[in-house]
């Protein structure tokens, strides 16, 4: 894909973003505030997922392992 097609594609994606969110009717300063708030919220969701999802997955795995009769990690560590 050459640079002209890539630029046109990115321009088309940005146009779709403007239409889907409805911010094409806003003034430029309102668009920048909206984009800042949206970017901040997306960044917070990504950061929170990065920090807390692994913890919850580990706890869920421990819970389900105990349900099916597996030994907890502390018991296995003591036996060796």
Curated annotation (Swiss-Prot):
Pathway membership: Lipid metabolism; sphingolipid metabolism
Superkingdom as given in the UniProt entry: Eukaryota
InterPro entries hit by this protein: Ser_palmitoyltrfase_ssu-like
Gene Ontology terms describing biological process: ceramide biosynthetic process; endoplasmic reticulum organization; sphingolipid biosynthetic process
Family statement: Belongs to the SPTSS family. SPTSSB subfamily.
PANTHER family for the chain: SERINE PALMITOYLTRANSFERASE SMALL SUBUNIT B (PTHR28612:SF1)
Function: Component of the serine palmitoyltransferase multisubunit enzyme (SPT) that catalyzes the initial and rate-limiting step in sphingolipid biosynthesis by condensing L-serine and activated acyl-CoA (most commonly palmitoyl-CoA) to form long-chain bases. The SPT complex is composed of SPTLC1, SPTLC2 or SPTLC3 and SPTSSA or SPTSSB. Within this complex, the heterodimer consisting of SPTLC1 and SPTLC2/SPTLC3 forms the catalytic core. Within the SPT complex, SPTSSB stimulates the catalytic activity and plays a role in substrate specificity.
Protein name: Serine palmitoyltransferase small subunit B
Species assigned in the record: Danio rerio (Zebrafish)
